[in-house]
C-alpha cells in the first residue's frame, strides 16, 4: 500500500483491532461484482507495497494460503484500521463496499506455486562500476548508515557528516556489517541483498535471494550471508564477497527471523506458524530443530547469548528460553503485543534491564534480565514503535506516534517530552558509537534526519529526507558490543571510575562487561 510496512510478516499484516462492517453493507456487496472491482482498488492503493501480482515488495505477499485463517469481512475491517505496528496507515476513507472488494480480491485464487532457485539467483546478480570513492572514515565506531525509505536511498554518515549516498529500490532496513566494518549488506523486501564497501565507497554486487525476504544475517567470520525468505519459504546462503549462492535450505514454515551468534558458529531462527526453534551451523549449513511450547513471532537474544526472549503473535505472554537446554525459565502475562525487535538494554544499580514498546498500546514495559522479572509499565502518551538508550544518556528515548520525543529517566522512570519538529512525526533514535550524537528521524515525505547533542539536546545538523526510518551504528547494532556498553555504567557505578576495581562481588555478566570496556581503554 502507499506507505511501506516495516518489520512485518505475512500474518502480522492483519493483526490489529477490528471494527465491524455493518451487515447491510455486507449483504449489498454479495450482489456486486467481486474480483475486477477489488483488483482495481488493490492496484490503486495496495500494489505499491504488495506488488501487482501480490507477491510482496516492502509489504508481505498476499496469497490465499497465507490468509486462509481470515474471512473477507475480518480482512476488510483490518485494512480499514491500518497497522501502526508496521507504519501502515488507516484506509478508513474507503467505504465498506470498497474495503470488502479489496479483501475478496486478496483472498482470490492465484498461481502461488512460486520458486526461486540457484539459477534464478545467479541470473539476478547486478554489478556496478561506481567510481572509487574512499570515504575517509575517521573512526569506524562512529559509522551510521541511514535508510531513506521513500527516497530509495541509503546514506553513510559519520558524526554530523554525510559521507555518501547510494540508490537501492525498496530498501527497508535490517542492515548488517562485517565485523571489520569494511562492508555492509542491505536487504530489500523484494528479495535483493546489496553489498556496499565502506572502504572504497562503492556498490559491489547485488543479488536477488528470493521473491520476498524477511531478514539477513552474517556468519561471525564474515564469509557467508544468510537470507531468510517468506516467498519461497527457504533460507539462502550467499558468498559474502561474490554474492553468488552457495546453497538453498528449504523451510517448511513462515520464518520469523534469523540471528547469528558472535560467540560460536551458529545462528538461530523461529517460525511464526510452527512451534520450532531452528539452529543453523554457519559453517556446514546443517539445520537442527527443537520443539518448543508455541510458535515465536518476535524475539531477540540477550546480550550474552544465553537466553532467547520471545512472544507469540497473540502477544499475551512473554517467554524466556534458556538456550543451554531450550527450556522456558520465565513467563509473564502481558496486556499488549511487545515489539521485541525494538527492545533496548542497559545496566543500573546492579541489574541488567531491557525495555520494549507495545503494539497499539500507549506504554513501554521495563524488565529485569537474568533475575527475570517484570519491573514497570511506563505511560508514554501514545502507541510508539521504538525505545532506545545509550550509557551516555540518563534517559530511555521513545517515540509515541506523534511529534513528541519521550524521555524516560532510567532511575525513577519519570517522563518528560521534547518536540524535535512541531506537527511532524518523530520516530526512532540511534546514537553514535560513543553516544555523543543522537540521530532522529522525522517520519514525513518532507522529513529530516536531525543530529543533536545527546546530553544537552542542542541541534547540530539537519538533512532533508523522504520518509527516513532505520539508522544503524556499527557499535549499537552489533550484539558483540553490548557487554562493552554495559561496562561503561558498571565502571561508573561500581568502580567509581577508578582502577584497580574490586570485582570479587561481581557476577559473571558484570565481569565480562567490565573487561570488555576496559579492553577498549587499552
Give the location of each predicted region.
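Electrostatic cytochrome c docking/interface patches
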Residues: 21-41, 132-133
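Extracytoplasmic electron-transfer domains, predominantly the class I c-type cytochrome c fold
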Residues: 32, 48, 53-58, 62-111
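A short beta-strand motif characteristic of beta-propeller blades
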Residues: 124, 161-167, 202-207, 244-250, ...
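Repeated scaffold domains used in trafficking and secretory/extracellular systems
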Residues: 125-134, 171-177, 212-220, 253-260, ...
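Short coil/turn segments that connect the beta-strands within blades of beta-propeller domains
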Residues: 141-142, 180-182, 221-223, 263-266, ...
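Short loop/turn segments that connect beta-strands within beta-propeller blades
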Residues: 158-161, 197-201, 239-243, 281-285, ...
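Asp-box/WD-like beta-propeller blade repeats and closely related beta-sheet repeat scaffolds
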Residues: 212-223, 228-236, 240-276, 285, ...
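Blade-level signature of beta-propeller repeat domains, shared across WD40, Kelch, NHL, RCC1
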Residues: 442-522
Amino acid at each position: 500500500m502507499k506507505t511501506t510496512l516495516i518489520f512485518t510478516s505475512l500474518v502480522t499484516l492483519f493483526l490489529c483491532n477490528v471494527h465491524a462492517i455493518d451487515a447491510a453493507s455486507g449483504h449489498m456487496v454479495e450482489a456486486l461484482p467481486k474480483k475486477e472491482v477489488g483488483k482495481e482498488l488493490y492496484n490503486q492503493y495496495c500494489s505499491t507495497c504488495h506488488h501487482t501480482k501480490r507477491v510482496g515488495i516492502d509489504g508481505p505477499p498476499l496469497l490465499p494460503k497465507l490468509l486462509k485463517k481470515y474471512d473477507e469481512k475480518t480482512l476488510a475491517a483490518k485494512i480499514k484500521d491500518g497497522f501502526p505496528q508496521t507504519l501502515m496507515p488507516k484506509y478508513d476513507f474507503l467505504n465498506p463496499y470498497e474495503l470488502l472488494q479489496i479483501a475478496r480480491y486478496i483472498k482470490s485464487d492465484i498461481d502461488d506455486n512460486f520458486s526461486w532457485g540457484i539459477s534464478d539467483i545467479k541470473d539476478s546478480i547486478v554489478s556496478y562500476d561506481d567510481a572509487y570513492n574512499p570515504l575517509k572514515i575517521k573512526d569506524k565506531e562512529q559509522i551510521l548508515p541511514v535508510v531513506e525509505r521513500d527516497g530509495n536511498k541509503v546514506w553513510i554518515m559519520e558524526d554530523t557528516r554525510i559521507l555518501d549516498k547510494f540508490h537501492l529500490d525498496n530498501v527497508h532496513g535490517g542492515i548488517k556489517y562485517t565485523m571489520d566494518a569494511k562492508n555492509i549488506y542491505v536487504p530489500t523486501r523484494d528479495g535483493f541483498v546489496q553489498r556496499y564497501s565502506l572502504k572504497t565507497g562503492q556498490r559491489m554486487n547485488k543479488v536477488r535471494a528470493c521473491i520476498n525476504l524477511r531478514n539477513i544475517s552474517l556468519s561471525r567470520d564474515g564469509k557467508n550471508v544468510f537470507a531468510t525468505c517468506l516467498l519461497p519459504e527457504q533460507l539462502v546462503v550467499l558468498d559474502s564477497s561474490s554474492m553468488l549462492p552457495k546453497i538453498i535450505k528449504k523451510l517448511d514454515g513462515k520464518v520469523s527471523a534469523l540471528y547469528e551468534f558472535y560467540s560460536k558458529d551458529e545462528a538461530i531462527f523461529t517460525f511464526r506458524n510452527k512451534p520450532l526453534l531452528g539452529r543453523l551451523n554457519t559453517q556446514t549449513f546443517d539445520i537442527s530443530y527443537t520443539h518448543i511450547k508455541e510458535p515465536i513471532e518476535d524475539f531477540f537474544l540477550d546480550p550474552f547469548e544465553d537466553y532467547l526472549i520471545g512472544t507469540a503473535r497473540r502477544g499475551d505472554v512473554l517467554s524466556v528460553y534458556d538456550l543451554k537446554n531450550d527450556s522456558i525459565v520465565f513467563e509473564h502475562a502481558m496486556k499488549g503485543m511487545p515489539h521485541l525487535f525494538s527492545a533496548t538494554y542497559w545496566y543500573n544499580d546492579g541489574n541488567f534491564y531491557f525495555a520494549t514498546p507495545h503494539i497499539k498500546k500507549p506504554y513501554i514495559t521495563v524488565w529485569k534480565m537474568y533475575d527475570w522479572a517484570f519491573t514497570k509499565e511506563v505511560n508514554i502518551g501514545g502507541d510508539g514503535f521504538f525505545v532506545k538508550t545509550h550509557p551516555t544518556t540518563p534517559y530511555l528515548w521513545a517515540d509515541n506516534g506523534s511529534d513528541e520525543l519521550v524521555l524516560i529517566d532510567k532511575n525513577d522512570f519519570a517522563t518528560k517530552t521534547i518536540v524535535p519538529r512541531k506537527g511532524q512525526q518523530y520516530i526512532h533514535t540511534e546514537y553514535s558509537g560513543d553516544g555523543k550524537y543522537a540521530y532522529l528521524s522525522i517520519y514525513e515525505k518532507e522529513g529530516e534526519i536531525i543530529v543533536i547533542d545527546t546530553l544537552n539536546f542542542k541541534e547540530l545538523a539537519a538533512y532533508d529526507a523522504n520518509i527516513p526510518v532505520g539508522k544503524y551504528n556499527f557499535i549499537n547494532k552489533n550484539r558483540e558490543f553490548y557487554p562493552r556498553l554495559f561496562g561503561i555504567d558498571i565502571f561508573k557505578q561500581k568502580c567509581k571510575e577508578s582502577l584497580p576495581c574490586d570485582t570479587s562481588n561481581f557476577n559473571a555478566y558484570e565481569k565480562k562487561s567490565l573487561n570488555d570496556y576496559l579492553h577498549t581503554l587499552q
